[in-house]
UniProtKB/Swiss-Prot annotation:
Gene Ontology cellular component annotations, sorted alphabetically: mitochondrion
Gene of this entry: GPP1
Record protein name field: (DL)-glycerol-3-phosphatase 1, mitochondrial
Activity at various pH: Optimum pH is 7.0.
PANTHER family: (DL)-GLYCEROL-3-PHOSPHATASE 1, MITOCHONDRIAL, 2-DEOXYGLUCOSE-6-PHOSPHATE PHOSPHATASE 2
UniProt cofactor(s): Mg(2+)
Phylogenetic lineage: Eukaryota, Viridiplantae, Streptophyta, Embryophyta, Tracheophyta
Enzyme class: hydrolase
Active site: 77, 79
Length: 298
């Protein structure tokens, strides 16, 4: 539940109609015991703007309660969410574009994040206007040679180890669904193999069941099927993502999703997620019916 002063703004989706839509107040003991909740038609979206500094990325949280209290399984993205690898992609892609006197901006990066390598490469060369000089395939080869020395130095994102160990220790099934292919996955995780061994399974971008990359739901649906009791009811799955395409993929799979975006990402990309956090350290498991942390981190 929100504990800070909250302002709710109802946004009609789509905006064309001016008809009034009734809102009713009804008790919902399952989600908020002994507290009234606002029930609204699907055509309304409520955004809670908390009284926190404007710079905080979690100042805006989309409030939905469909999956609250019913989560049984958790799926994690990897790059930019568990591992601090997105900076490597940015560094390399900036260097490549500099040769063509072009700059790499966050609007393009936002579109590339979370996608399969070839899909991201096509976006890169097409939208940066260098496709006549550099093919998507050649871009991948060049980028690969620059990244292979950087990936083994990957650090964990804040709160990643704490959250993974907590959920695993409490018996919550966890796994990874990433657009990264197998060879890069091995390079990125080689310093953290003990932690990643806690995963029930990993679905990578080159998995034969993943026909299309994010925002298609293939990866998350494959991950759901591979749990011991799978396929899991998507309403009982919580996904953690940092990329807009990954958030949309989770929603396309019918799952709940928490977004932990880079602070430089435009906030307009964060509207689809069920909850937006500045860091994994800010996650409160009990809000989703999961066991609370036992440590004192606030």
């Amino acid at each position: 539940m929100l504990t800070t002063p909250t302002r709710f703004v109802a946004l009609r989706i789509p905006f064309r109609s001016s008809n009034k839509i009734p809102i009713s107040i009804a008790p919902s003991p399952k989600v908020f015991p002994r507290k009234p909740v606002i029930r609204v038609p699907a055509s309304l979206r409520f955004v809670a703007t908390m009284s926190t500094p404007a710079a905080a990325v979690n100042a805006t949280v989309t409030v939905t309660d469909a999956g609250r209290g019913s989560i049984t399984h958790v799926i994690f993205d990897m790059d930019g969410l568990l591992l601090d690898t997105e900076k490597f992609y940015t560094e390399v892609q900036e260097k490549i574009l500099a040769r063509y006197n072009k700059t790499f901006d966050w609007s393009l990066k936002a579109k590339m994040m979370g996608r399969k390598a070839i899909e991201a490469a096509r976006l890169f060369v097409d939208e940066s206007g260098i496709s006549d000089s550099l093919s998507a395939e050649d871009f991948i080869v060049e980028r690969e040679s620059m990244l292979q020395d950087l990936f083994p130095t990957s650090d964990l994102m804040p709160g990643a180890s704490r959250l993974l160990r907590h959920l695993h220790g409490k018996g919550i099934p966890i796994c990874i669904a990433t657009g990264t292919h197998t060879r890069h996955f091995d390079l990125k995780t080689q310093r953290h193999r003990e932690l990643f061994s806690l995963m029930h399974h990993v679905v990578r971008g080159d998995d034969p069941e993943v026909k299309e990359g994010k925002p298609a739901p293939d990866g998350f649906l494959a991950a759901s099927r591979r749990f011991e009791d799978g396929p899991v009811d998507p309403r009982k799955v919580l996904v953690f993502e940092d990329a807009p395409s990954g958030v949309q993929a989770a929603k396309n799979a019918g799952m709940n999703v928490i977004m932990v975006p880079d602070s430089r990402l435009d906030k307009s990309y964060c509207n689809v997620a069920d909850q937006v956090l500045a860091s994994l350290l800010d996650f409160k498991p009990e809000e989703w019916g999961l066991p609370s942390f036992q440590d004192s981190h606030n």
